[in-house]
């Protein structure tokens, strides 16, 4: 097996993206009045055409500009908490399975600091060799510097690390650009109507993580 480490996104991979949806919807409604139907339409439109930041798009759509984006995200981060039902059991099993195969494990995720506490509660924290949470490291995907930091901290060549995420634009493409291998997980904020190019972008494309350790071992 050529892969020696795996980096995981959190939302859509280990936990449901519904936690972010709940938080940002609540935060928007603290600043203005937004219906669930209008919110869902903007959210879905972005998933189908993921051009730029979803957070910025929501801010512009409902607050008229980016002037209050920092305030919006401050409010959202206070509510951005995973509950027990948000955890993907196949994600947890895949992470544990890859660790048992001898891989180093990293996190590369745009998340608030509180997500590290959730990893501790779910007994995943101690399995992690590099904790890359945006609020803690000061980078956000798709910034290549975030992935470069993971490569440096895992102390392996890029082509021996595989990144697992559910976004082509913020996970697969930036990781590939640095020579990392990639897994595209088609759930959560993944484009529901992928192009042929999307389907061919990653080394592995899956709808769930049930067989991920075996698929990575076979690379």
List each language-model region with its residue ranges.
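Asp-based, Mg2+/Mn2+-dependent phosphohydrolase catalytic module
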Residues: 1-4, 69-70, 92, 96-99, ...
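N-terminal helical cap/lid subdomain that shapes the substrate entry/recognition surface
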Residues: 2-101, 113-117
């Amino acid at each position: 097996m050529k892969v020696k480490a795996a980096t995981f996104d959190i939302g859509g991979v280990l936990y449901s993206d519904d936690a972010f949806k709940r938080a940002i919807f609540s935060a928007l409604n603290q600043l203005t009045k937004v219906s669930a139907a209008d919110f869902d339409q903007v959210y879905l439109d972005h998933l189908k055409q993921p051009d730029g930041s979803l957070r910025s798009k929501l801010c512009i759509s409902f607050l008229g500009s980016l002037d209050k984006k920092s305030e919006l995200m401050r409010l959202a981060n206070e509510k951005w908490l995973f509950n027990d039902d948000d955890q993907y059991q196949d994600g947890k099993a895949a992470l544990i399975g890859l660790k048992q195969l001898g891989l180093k494990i990293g996190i590369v995720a745009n998340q608030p600091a509180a997500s590290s506490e959730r990893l501790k509660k779910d007994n995943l924290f101690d399995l992690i060799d590099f904790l890359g949470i945006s609020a803690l490291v000061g980078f956000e995907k798709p910034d290549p510097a975030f992935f470069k930091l993971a490569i440096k901290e895992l102390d392996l060549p890029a082509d021996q690390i595989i990144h697992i995420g559910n976004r082509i634009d913020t996970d697969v493409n930036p990781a590939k650009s640095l020579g990392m291998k990639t897994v595209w997980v088609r759930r959560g904020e993944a484009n529901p109507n992928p192009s042929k190019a999307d389907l061919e972008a990653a080394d592995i494309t899956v709808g769930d993580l049930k067989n991920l350790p075996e698929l990575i071992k076979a690379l």
